[in-house]
Amino acid sequence: MERKKITEQISCLPATEEPLSADVGLIRCGEEWWIYDVGRSQGAADAINGLQGRKNIVLSHFHPDHTGNIDAVEYDAQYAGAYTCRSLKRGTVVEGHMYFQGGIHLFPLPSSHAKGSLGLEVGEYAFLGDGTYCMVKGGQAMYNAGLLRELILTLEALRARFVLQSHREPFLCPKEEALAMLREIYARRDSREPYILLESL
């Protein structure tokens, strides 16, 4: 699978539909790599295994299109939220903000889409996985109003100017553009209701 260059330091392995496989973020920090999600396609696994140097994997959440290759790739360390670590029975749990050499910042991401989501910020870029997306219950798309408010505050606090959201085209967009959409949805809330229902997916 061919890597898609974002900056001199950052690249990605694009998402696929068949099999459903998330975008994989690749950040080069000196002699080591930070890999955000591992996808589920053979192409993503082969590309990750072809990287030279120490490999640190960060999993955005537990869904298989983001974690499916975890047994197929070689790595030195793996970080995820508590729910993902429990689901996979492995990894270092990230419960708060964590900072590493190379400007890597891991942070919990309040998400309606998946419990225990995790983001990765480096410089002007923040990888969010599916963290900004809604949940679906009984065929109805919705956001948890409280979590959506926390998500907006979390994104506002990031220094990043751009966000990268899995399965979305374009993968990269200005943070303010993503925030504008989330604020518009939050403005529809009914203070008496815990969820904000969406008209369509």
Where do the protein language model's features map onto the residues?
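Conserved beta-strand hairpin/beta-sheet module of binuclear metal-dependent hydrolase folds
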Residues: 1-49, 118-135
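Short acidic-hydrophobic surface loop/beta-edge motif
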Residues: 4-6, 27, 94-102
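Hydrophobic residues at beta-strand termini and immediately following loops
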Residues: 13, 36, 93-94, 107-109
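Residues that act as N-cap/strand-start positions at coil-to-secondary-structure junctions
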Residues: 19-21, 92-94, 114
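Short glycine/proline-enriched coil/turn segments at helix->beta-strand junctions
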Residues: 30-31, 50-54, 71-77, 102, ...
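Metallo-beta-lactamase
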Residues: 33, 41, 105, 110-199
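Active-site HxH/HxHxD metal-binding segment of metal-dependent hydrolases
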Residues: 40-100
